[in-house]
């Protein structure tokens, strides 16, 4: 293992241990040995998550005039997941271990070296038999006896009680096979030969209602976005918004991830924060504004304009989301991956992944996709309920087009349609058929007819972020260690969590200098009562003041307020009712009047 990899593991271990020690994140069901890929947020974690949620909600909905919120259910009619494509295609390619049936993601098998050992089967004195051949990789450096023991143990745990005692299982007709280098055909943990790659759907199934037949199957939502599409018309009709506008939602999502890993980064239950921002198709913008503004380097993205096409809107949201991350202290650890045409889904026009530096590598934090009208159109077809909106301005502008202008637009759409058919067929590795072209021609003509009458299915830009990944990203970014010499001259490593004040779970620690001085305690409780109505504070009177600062540094608290004898007026009237305000990151300490505290702190933490 490389030094970098070892350091990354060590860093993650420290972060996981801090999260448990200070009550940020616990393993779910820990007293029962845990529950794979599921995590619980402790008192500090719950506050941190709530702050992140609030920053997202405020920035994305409340502070904007063009985005509304939604809070939809986790369980929905399974027809939604059929229409969205999740039932048929939301799958990872998996390979199964022939020894244990344990699955592994096909693209997660690291190459291994070793010798193949073959057995015709196994039996035990209980009469139990395994009547099929098995092949296992004896890894380079592994002793044959330890391989046999491993195989017996795996067989026994798969067979259950019937196989009897592990040590009494007999492996039959052992034969040495090929020596392999960099093989990816054996399970990385068990060493058992892997079967062919097969798709494995990531949706978690459940049954709705008292009977548990196939007709009652539904799914825990694997993303929050589909509810936004399914409720698009209700929100549109009830809010009197005009396109362009967006609908944002925060909520739980579930994916039966095959290999949940890297702490909360890849979980089976997690929270998403998604925005579907609905825009006019470029053709509608062109008819209304005469020309569509497309993106070029240096384009002004500060304020949306009526002539923006999808490209500008996509770039705008990448810019907005970048500003969001800057506002929570992640600005300098972001990278962008623009998906190539080969990466893109056939309906997507562009997609950028916002990546973040984690100890285990630079990984996706958020995806921002321009998805055309794929989602609303899919629901329109499947539900047979129109998802079109009527745009008076478009109708008026279209009425002024000449017949030639309309024909030219139609011809352009037909050409685009033919190219889409070819591209889709190419992705599916087949020849496009005459029927494909005929269907596309019909659909393009329909689109133009409806457009000229002022109707269209809105297109969408989708910034989709994960709350748990964001929480982990801010913790990982904030984690730092410094060496300190304590009061007795002993060196110790102090952990300081340099969380941005906006997301820090506790904003201010309030400390009376001494706990046995009633006047200090009374004043400190007064300050605590004043602040806690406006922000999450922590009152602490135990241990030395240095220890108390250190405890709050480790919890990520950005400010500390100490109430001392000066506060009580013992060193003259000019310092009476002032406190020491300590800034975690700069170490600066300043004297502030109690009456000025709130005004000073509020802008820093919100
Ligand atoms: P990945 O490629 O990492 O599996 P994805 O591209 O499938 O992610 P999306 O479907 O685009 O992810 O989901 C949007 C966001 O939801 C992701 O950027 C991520 O922040 C979050 N997310 C997705 N899957 C998980 C998961 N298993 N655990 C935690 N967060 C997740």
Predicted regions and their residues:
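NTP/phosphate- and nucleic-acid-binding module
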Residues: 1-606
């Amino acid at each position: 293992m490389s030094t970098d990899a070892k350091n990354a593991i060590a860093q993650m271990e420290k972060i996981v241990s801090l999260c448990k020690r200070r009550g940020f994140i616990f393993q779910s069901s820990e007293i029962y040995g845990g529950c794979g890929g599921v995590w619980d947020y402790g008192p500090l974690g719950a506050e941190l998550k709530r702050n992140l949620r609030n920053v997202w909600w405020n920035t994305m909905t409340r502070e904007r005039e063009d985005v509304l919120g939604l809070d939809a259910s986790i369980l929905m009619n399974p027809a939604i997941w059929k229409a969205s494509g999740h039932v048929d295609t939301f799958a990872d390619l998996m390979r199964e271990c022939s020894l244990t049936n344990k699955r592994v993601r096909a693209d997660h098998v690291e190459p291994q070296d070793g010798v193949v050992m073959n057995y015709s089967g196994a039996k035990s004195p209980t009469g139990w038999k395994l009547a099929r051949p098995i092949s296992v990789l004896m890894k380079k450096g592994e002793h044959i006896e330890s391989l046999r023991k491993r195989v017996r143990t795996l067989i026994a745990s798969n067979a259950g009680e019937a196989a009897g005692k592990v040590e009494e299982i007999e492996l039959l007709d052992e034969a040495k096979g090929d020596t392999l280098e960099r093989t990816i055909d054996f399970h990385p943990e068990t060493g058992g030969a892997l079967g062919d790659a097969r798709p494995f759907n990531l949706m978690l199934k459940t049954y709705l209602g008292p009977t548990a037949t196939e007709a009652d199957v539904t799914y825990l939502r694997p993303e929050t976005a589909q509810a936004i599409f399914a409720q698009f018309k209700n929100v549109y009709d009830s809010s009197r918004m005009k396109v362009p506008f967006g609908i944002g939602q925060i909520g739980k999502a579930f994916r039966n991830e095959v290999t949940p890993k890297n702490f909360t980064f890849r979980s089976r239950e997690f929270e998403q924060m998604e925005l579907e921002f609905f825009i006019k198709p470029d053709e509608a913008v062109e008819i209304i504004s005469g020309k569509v503004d497309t993106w070029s380097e240096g384009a002004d993205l500060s304020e949306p304009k009526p002539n923006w096409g999808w490209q500008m809107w996509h770039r705008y949201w990448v810019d907005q989301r970048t500003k969001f991350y800057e506002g929570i202290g992640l600005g300098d650890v972001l990278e962008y991956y623009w998906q190539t045409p080969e990466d893109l889904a056939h309906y997507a026009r562009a997609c950028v992944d916002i990546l973040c530096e984690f100890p285990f590598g630079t990984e996706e934090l958020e995806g921002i996709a321009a998805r055309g009208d794929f989602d609303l159109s899919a629901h329109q077809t499947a539900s047979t309920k129109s998802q079109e909106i009527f745009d008076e301005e478009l109708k008026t502008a279209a009425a002024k087009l000449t017949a030639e202008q309309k024909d030219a637009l139609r011809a352009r759409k037909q050409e685009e349609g033919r190219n889409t058919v070819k591209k889709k067929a190419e992705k599916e590795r087949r020849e496009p058929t005459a029927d494909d072209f005929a269907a596309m021609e019909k659909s393009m003509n329909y689109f133009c007819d409806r457009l000229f009458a002022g109707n269209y299915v809105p297109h969408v830009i989708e910034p989709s972020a994960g709350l748990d990944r964001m929480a982990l990203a801010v913790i990982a970014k904030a984690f730092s260690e410094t060496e300190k010499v304590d009061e007795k001259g002993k060196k110790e490593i102090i952990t300081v969590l340099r969380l941005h004040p906006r997301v820090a779970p506790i904003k201010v620690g309030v400390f009376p200098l001494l706990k046995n001085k009633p006047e200090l305690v009374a004043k400190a409780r007064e300050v605590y009562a004043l602040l806690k109505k406006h922000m999450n504070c922590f009152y602490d009177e135990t241990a030395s003041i240095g220890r108390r600062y250190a405890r709050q540094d480790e919890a990520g608290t950005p400010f500390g307020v100490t109430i001392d004898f000066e506060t009580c007026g013992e060193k003259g009237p000019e310092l009476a009712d002032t406190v020491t305000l300590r800034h975690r990151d700069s170490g600066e300490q300043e004297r502030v009047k109690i009456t000025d505290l709130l005004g000073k702190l509020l802008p820093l933490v919100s």
